[in-house]
Structure formats: structure tokens, C-alpha cells
Amino acid sequence: MAETRIRRLPVGIQSFEKIRKDGYLYVDKTDIIWRLANTDNTYNYLSRPRRFGKSLLVDTLEAYFLGKKELFEGLRIIELEKEWVKRPVVRLDMSQAGAEPESVRSYLDDVFHTLEAEYKIVVRQDCSLAVRFKNIIEGAYNKTGQQVAILIDEYDAPLQHSWKTPHHEACTSIYREVFAILKANDKYERFVFITGITKFTQISLFSVLNNLSNISFEPEYAAICGITKEEMLRNFKPEIDKLAAYENHTYDEAVAQLTAYYDGYHFSHDNMADIFNPFSLVNALSDSKLRNYWAASGATSLLPKFVDNIEIRLKNFENCPIDSDTLETSDVTGGGAELFLYQSGYLTIKGYTDGIYILGIPNYEVRKALYKIVLPALTLKTNDQVISTQSMLLYNLQLGNLPEAMKCLKALVADVPYSNKKLASMDMEERYRLILSTIFNAIGCRVEVEKMIATGRIDMVVETIHIIYVLELKLSNNGGIHAATQQIQYKQYAEPFKADKRRVVALAIELDDQGKGLVDWKEA
């Protein structure tokens, strides 16, 4: 019997050379990469969310400019590139530079020292970082006779992490000093490529390089990072089959699950091809499990720095309009919460009309992560208190064990509408809807608030894997449990869902009109 060859998926690998030499699966993007490397624009900037393949893209560009043809054999670029010229490459990975001016200077000093040794550049003791950078670019050109490729990966990492700290202005000053020389040295530069997540326009990368081409929204580069559905189906069929077997699904059901969890990103209104988060997708296919990989990797750590009061604003981001100038050109520190959430991957483009983008949450993984993060702040509880209770709530909802589920829900809601002063501007029913929908989203349920059907408007529909819950909420001073039960029965709220193979449970819930929490419940 022939031995089955185990395919190697590049989980967390950002080295193009390692992927190619060690036999890892590579989704071929080299035709797009070649077009980028040979564009008429010398200076190019790409923004993509964290863990979206930017560093692998930079590493692939480095291999290309170093003329490493052997790494590209069998890929599309072989048909496009005829010369394979070896060029000098200056590469900076600013994610290694820390978040304080001393660490940024130390990182640049180390990189420059290595390059100066490589190109035999004599450095005066009093040389500034900017002068050293200038001398490296000129020296590399003079020694090789070839223009230099400059690759700056995660340029914004020190600026993000120092934001709202005493170190931010000093870090910004270093950027202004060092990177201002890029334009002055343009005759020595073949290609300059800068990647990041957020855009800080006050630094010299954007203010001095007025001819910097922002390719982040260009349709031809929409899929340069990430994995399209076509690429997933073409490259990962064995892994999808394996996931389907583990989850007891058909192949098509497994594809639908992967799509719901990790797909849904769009980066150009002129090219709305769905893009999967590559980090999450490859991890899921490697593990044969559907998990929240992106959030678990620390992707949500910067939210509190850039978005105030997100726990009460999150519902506003579901279908969020933002004008094109703000989304495409604004500084993250002054463009509002929507801009940061888009650049960081929490929101994506859902539509576009007459200069206005419509943004929304891309997929299940991001939705659950966002709501899970805001739940402790909204309920005024510690993370530890919330985690154990919400786990028990989901467990009992999935089993249909309503008495235990309602105990958990009561514990999470208790006193919150009254005690959380950030909710003071909302009426009491609106407070309860926000709290309950946040809880159900945070545990991974599919939630629809105020769902319209032929006979009326259902307060909330909550879907688990095996059960659909139809909720009618009534305050104690508005009829309470009796009125909620009557409305469910009279308007036949459960009927539209009975064609679903899942069990349907209609729940009447009475809520304290003073904001003290859940008073009573009844299966209607």
C-alpha cells in the first residue's frame, strides 16, 4: 500500500526561503508580487491587518530582489521575470524595535551596523542615524552598481505601541529624522516598499514622500495578502476533506463553516473578492478545528488605546458609513474609531456608493472576539468572573438546559443596566438589548436584534448549533412575563423558524424596570 504523503502547512512561517526549501505548501502570489515590484511607482505603501501575510510578502520581495531564482521555480513569476538581477536590499522589521526611543535607536543601530560591515562603509563616531542610513543606500549602490530595494515591514509597530505614552513623540521624531532621507536618495533607489497596519501621517514617511503610492485600496492588489476562496479550494482540498471528517460534515458544509469563520474581508470597492484571514485559515486547516486563532494571537490588544467606550459603541459598527477620504487618507489618530477598526481588521468594506464606504464586521471569528473583549467592561465584572459564567451559559444553551442557562444569564446581567453609568443616555429596554446581545455574541451565538417577520418584530433571535431561541423581552412595568408570553403566542414568533432542522424554543423574559436585571422567564 502506498504511503500517504503528509502535506506541510506553513503555520506561522514568514520565511519564503524556508517555505520553498522545506516543502511547505505555498499559495502562489508571485504574479501579483512581480507586478508590484515592477510598477512605475518607486515608493509604495500597503496597509493590511495583523497576521495577514505582510511579512511573508516582504520576505518574498527580498528573495526576488536578491535574484534567488531557484526559490521561484515552478511559480508564475518564472514566466514573467527574464533577467533575475541581484540587487542590494535594505530591510527593516520595525516590529523588532520596541516602543521606546532607546529601543528604536538601538534596533536601527544594530541593523545599520550589519549593513555597514557588509558594504565596507566607514562610520564616523558622531554620525547620526539619518546620515548612516543615507550612506548605506549610497554605499550599497556604489559597491554593486545596482539601485537598492528598501523594504520597511510593520513600520508603525513602535508608533502603535507607544501611542498615548510619554514615548510617542520621541519615537515619531526618530522616524522623521531617519526616513526623511529616502526622497533625497531617490536616484539610488530601485523600489521602496512599506507595510503597516495603521497610518500615522505626521511622520516623514508620509509627509516627505508626497509621491508615496498607497496601494492598500487598489483592485489589482486586493488579494496580494490573504487567501481567496478560489485559492483555498484549489490548494487545500485534502485539508478541507480532513476537517469535514473531524466535524462530521460534508465537504460543502466544511467550506461553508470556514467561510463563515474566516472569510469576508474586502480591501477594494472595485474588487470585492472575498479574502480569508490566512493566519486563521491555515491554522484551522492544520489543526482540523474551527477556533478563534486571530484573536488568540493577541490581535485585539490595542483596542482600548484607539477606541474609547467600545463596549457601548460596538453595535454602531455593524453597518457603518465612512467617507472615502477619511478611510483612504486620514491619520489613525484623528480619523475616528471606524478608521482604526478598519485598518486593524475588525471592520471591512461591505459596500460603496458615491464616495461613501459601508463597513461591517467581516466574519464570525472577529465578531466573537470583539464582543468577548467588551463584555467585562460592559457588565462591570472581571475577565475571570465573565469567562466561567459565559462558558456555562453557552454549554447549557446548547443542551437546552434552560434553568441553568437562565441562572448564568441572570448572573451576567445583574444590576448592569442600573450600575453602568455609560448606559445612562439609553432607555431601559435599549440597555437590556445591548447587554443581552453582547453576551450572546461573546459566547459565539448568531444574534439578530429586532428581527422583522410578517407578524411583527421579534426582540432577539439567538442561534446555537442545535437550538434557535426566540426571545421576547418585557419590563416589569410593561406587562412583564405575562405580556411577553402572550405576544410570542399571539404573533406566532416561533413559526418562521420551524422549517429549520434545529429545535425552536420561544422564551418570554421579564426584566426589572429599574435596571436590576432578569426577574423571571418562561418557555412560551
Segments and roles (model prediction):
Residues 169-175, 475-494:
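Mg2+/Mn2+-dependent nuclease catalytic core
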Residues 496, 500-524:
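Domain-level recognition of nuclease-like catalytic cores that cleave nucleotide substrates
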Residues 140-144, 439-465:
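Active-site metal-binding core of divalent-cation-utilizing nuclease and nuclease-like domains
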Residues 149, 467-471, 505:
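Structural motif
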Residues 178-185, 339-347, 437-442, 487-507:
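Metal-dependent nuclease catalytic cores in nucleic-acid-processing enzymes
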Residues 436, 460-477, 491:
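Conserved catalytic cores of phosphodiester-cleaving nucleases, focusing on short active-site segments
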Residues 1-428, 443-445:
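Phosphate-binding site recognition
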